[in-house]
Every structure is written in structure tokens, then in C-alpha cells.
Amino acid sequence: MQDDLDRVLPQSIKARATLSENEYVIPYPDVLEAIQIATEHAIAVLGVEVFQIIGDGLLAQEYSTYEFSLGDDWEAFVRLNNVQARDFVEHHARGEEHGYILTSTSKHEFADLR
């Protein structure tokens, strides 16, 4: 199922990404642009996973551990999460044969979970 981030990502990023089941494994530095696009569309990046792409599979390398509680301000929640997502990616930059999966949610997707 396509989520809101998938809907707003440009085809150019999707074309360079590896599709693993229903998730895009986005290469560096495209992942930084994807986080920026998420921010512009008020989509919170709740977590980042780094994978090595091996053959037709993925090998988990690292994952983010930041976590914020949602208060009354969705925009602040998005900013807090996405700044941490960007910092995590910048501190865990990987080259070829690697990519990132962004776990994300828009306000209405989050509300649907409740």
C-alpha cells in the first residue's frame, strides 16, 4: 500500500531507489532530499533504517533511536522528527550498495492509527 510519502516523492528518487516489497530503499544523498520533501508536506519521519543491498536482499546495518511524543502542534512534531532523521542520515552516510528506509506518517495517517 502506498503511503503519503510515497505519493509525494518524485519519480527521479523512486527510479534510483531499490524497491523491497512495498518500501523504497533510498540511496544517499537522495534520502536527504526525501526528508526535505517530507518536511515540506508535513510528513514526520519517525525512524530511519540503513541497509546494505546484497543481491536481491537487504542486510540491516543501523537504525535510528530518536523518539518524540506528539503534543498539540503537528508541525513542531514534524520538525523535531525530521531534523533528527536528517542528522542520523548525515552521521551514517553510506555509499553505493546501501540505502535507507524512512518510516513516516502524515497527520491523517497518524490519526487513522488511533
Which residues does each PLM region occupy?
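Short, well-structured hydrophobic secondary-structure segments
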Residues: 27-56
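Long, contiguous N-terminal structural blocks used for assembly/anchoring
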Residues: 1-25
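Short, solvent-exposed polar/charged micro-motifs at secondary-structure junctions
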Residues: 28-33, 55-62, 108-114
